[in-house]
Swiss-Prot record:
Annotated CDD domains: NAD_bind_1_Glu_DH
Encoding gene per record: GDH2
Family designation: Belongs to the Glu/Leu/Phe/Val dehydrogenases family.
Cellular-component GO terms for this entry: mitochondrion
Pfam families assigned: ELFV_dehydrog (PF00208), ELFV_dehydrog_N (PF02812)
Keywords noted in UniProt: Mitochondrion, NAD, NADP, Oxidoreductase, Transit peptide
Enzyme class: oxidoreductase
Active site positions, chain numbering: K102
Cellular localisation: Mitochondrion
E.C. numbers: 1.4.1.3
Protein name per UniProt: Glutamate dehydrogenase 2, mitochondrial
Tissue and organ distribution: Expressed in roots. Expressed ubiquitously in various tissues.
PANTHER family in the record: GLUTAMATE DEHYDROGENASE (PTHR11606), NAD-SPECIFIC GLUTAMATE DEHYDROGENASE (PTHR11606:SF24)
Length: 411
């Protein structure tokens, strides 16, 4: 089941639990606006290349639309649509005043030079500048984009609208980016994990973890687990997977990776088959990489007691059912990986106020938002007798539905 089908299915289940009327349910699914633009740029060799850019603006009942821009060869309108819809529910679960959006350009960023990427980003911004803005739609980095991409968007947008630091988040610090943004998703994942473990009388200290993915989110999660006395006993990325039953030395592994070393070449670990990573014995499994990695083939063999969805849509619905029957508790992506968008919101607030926070305040506020969301999700689980995924979806959908009705948009 693809991301769009799974997101729509979760939404419909939540709508049924909430007793939404069919007209309102239908209107909440339909995107506010879908944008498709053609971006032609001169390449460094003088030839012209054309790319298709998308932006799906799903819902703005609760505030400006918010979501990343990804550069990837397989950017597909259906996937962008699903991710935009997911952002609507995610921002509502996090109780930040945004709706949902997502965008992307179908390109292979690794095959374009820095100057070609800059030209492409600026042309894309020129095509959509009058449809985004601090109080309309606020993009952010995603797969294949970064703070430099956001700096180019900010600069190009400002040529039309004057200095507008709040038009994008995930910017470099020197252009109004927030301290703590780099670690935000990984740190949020660990605040969510702490909240869940505490509910079961456990803590990070003394628990064992397996992490799939060692990019930004996975490496921050591993670092924080290590600092808090937990053991990362297995870890994998695209280069391979490794394990150490006594716990990997995360600072040494980070140093090895930052010096260009592959995971499988790390001295203090045993190389393992990557297909065994997700079914490795552990207390907590954290998928931080791709969607759909937990499916009906491997779900019966999962040995973790808790799964924290740091990636988007890592568990397909069939795996969800199998894992539920096994008694595995899943903390859903819509909540678990919301640290990034929460700190993006803090960045936007700081830009609008023109008053920057220190990192301690950012982390303190993030902790508060993650804890509050968990308590609200638990309350929904109790009210509707459902699991954490449905608790989060009913919380998000209910907040958007209420805002929609209050605005008088339901007709």
């Amino acid at each position: 089941m693809n991301a769009l089908a799974a997101t729509s299915r979760n939404f419909r289940q939540a709508a049924r639990l909430l007793g939404l009327d069919s007209k309102l349910e239908k209107s909440l699914l339909i995107p506010f606006r879908e944008i498709k633009v053609e971006c032609t740029i001169p390449k460094d060799d003088g030839t012209l290349a054309s790319f298709i850019g998308f932006r799906v603006q799903h819902d703005n009942a609760r505030g400006p639309m918010k979501g990343g821009i990804r550069y990837h060869p397989e950017v597909d309108p259906d996937e962008v649509n699903a991710l935009a819809q997911l952002m609507t529910w995610k921002t509502a679960v996090a109780a930040i005043p945004y709706g949902g959006a997502k965008g992307g350009i179908g390109c292979a960023p690794g095959e374009l030079s820095t100057s070609e990427l800059e030209r492409l980003t600026r042309v894309f911004t020129q095509k959509i500048h009058d449809l985004i803005g601090a109080h309309t739609d606020v993009p952010a980095p995603d797969m294949g984009t970064n703070s430099q991409t956001m700096a180019w968007i900010l600069d190009e947008y400002s040529k039309f609208h004057g200095h507008s630091p709040a038009v994008v988040t995930g910017k470099p610090i020197d252009l109004g980016g927030s301290l703590g943004r780099d670690a935000a998703t990984g740190r949020g994942v660990m605040y969510a994990t702490e909240a869940l473990l505490a509910e079961h009388g456990k803590s990070i200290s003394g628990s064992t973890f397996v992490i799939q993915g060692f990019g930004n989110v996975g490496s921050w999660a591993a670092r924080i687990i290590h600092e808090k006395g937990g053991k990362v006993i297995a870890l994998g990325d695209v280069t391979g997977s490794i394990r150490n039953k006594n716990g990997l030395d995360i600072p040494a592994l980070m140093k090895h990776r930052n010096e260009g070393g592959a995971l499988k070449d790390f001295h203090d670990a045993e190389v393992m088959d990557s297909s065994e990573l997700l079914v490795h014995e552990c207390d907590v499994l954290i998928p931080c990489a791709l969607g759909g990695v937990l499916n009906r083939e491997n779900a019966p063999d999962v040995k973790a007691k808790f799964i924290i969805e740091a990636a988007n849509h890592p568990t397909d619905p069939e795996a969800d059912e199998i894992l539920a029957k096994k008694g595995v508790t899943i903390l859903p992506d819509i909540y678990a990986n919301s640290g990034g968008v929460i700190v993006s919101y803090f960045e936007w607030v700081q830009n609008i106020q023109g008053f920057m926070w220190d990192e301690e305040k950012v982390n303190m506020e993030l902790h508060k938002y993650m804890n509050n969301s968990f308590q609200h999700i638990k309350a929904m689980c109790k009210s509707h007798d459902c699991n954490l995924r449905m608790g989060a979806f009913t919380l998000g959908v209910n907040r958007v539905a209420r805002a929609t009705l209050l605005r008088g948009w339901e007709a």
